[in-house]
C-alpha cells in the first residue's frame, strides 16, 4: 500500500516543497509507519510507500483539510 501521510487532527497532507527524494518525507513516513516504509515528495505532499494494508493515509473520512 502507499499514500499521502495525513495529520490526524486536521485531515491535511504533510506538505513538502523539494519534489522527489526528500529527507523530511522519508523521516516522517518511517516515524509513522515503521522503518520499512519509504517516502518522497510528490505533488507537494509526502507520499509514503511500502505500507501495511491497514495503514491510515489521506484522505480521512469525514475530515477535510481546512
Swiss-Prot record:
- Domain LCN-type CS-alpha/beta span(s) in chain numbering: 1-66
Annotated Gene Ontology MF terms?
sodium channel inhibitor activity; toxin activity
Q: What's a GO cellular component annotated to this UniProt protein?
A: extracellular region
Which tissues is this protein detected in according to the database? Expressed by the venom gland.
Primary site of residence: secreted
Q: What keywords tag this UniProt record?
A: Amidation, Disulfide bond, Ion channel impairing toxin, Neurotoxin, Secreted, Toxin, Voltage-gated sodium channel impairing toxin
For this entry, list what GO says about its biological process. Answer: defense response
Task: Reply yes or no: does the keyword S-adenosyl-L-methionine apply.
Answer: no
What job does the chain carry out? Beta toxins bind voltage-independently at site-4 of sodium channels and shift the voltage of activation toward more negative potentials thereby affecting sodium channel activation and promoting spontaneous and repetitive firing. A mixture of Cbo2 and Cbo3 is weakly active on the human voltage-gated sodium channels Nav1.4/SCN4A and Nav1.6/SCN8A when tested at 200 nM. In vivo, is toxic to mice when intraperitoneally injected.
Q: Which family does it belong to?
A: Belongs to the long (4 C-C) scorpion toxin superfamily. Sodium channel inhibitor family. Beta subfamily.
Further comment found in the protein's record: Negative results: a mixture of Cbo2 and Cbo3 does not modify the currents of the human voltage-gated sodium channels Nav1.1/SCN1A, Nav1.2/SCN2A, Nav1.3/SCN3A, Nav1.5/SCN5A and Nav1.7/SCN9A.
Stated name of the protein: Beta-toxin Cbo2
What species is this protein from?
Answer: Centruroides bonito
Amino acid at each position: 500500500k502507499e499514500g499521502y501521510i495525513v495529520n490526524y487532527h486536521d485531515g491535511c497532507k504533510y506538505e513538502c516543497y523539494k519534489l522527489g527524494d526528500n529527507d523530511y518525507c522519508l523521516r516522517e513516513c518511517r516515524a509513522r509507519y515503521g522503518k520499512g516504509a519509504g517516502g518522497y515528495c510528490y505533488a507537494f505532499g509526502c507520499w509514503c510507500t511500502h505500507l501495511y494494508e491497514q495503514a491510515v493515509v489521506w484522505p480521512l473520512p469525514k475530515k477535510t483539510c481546512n
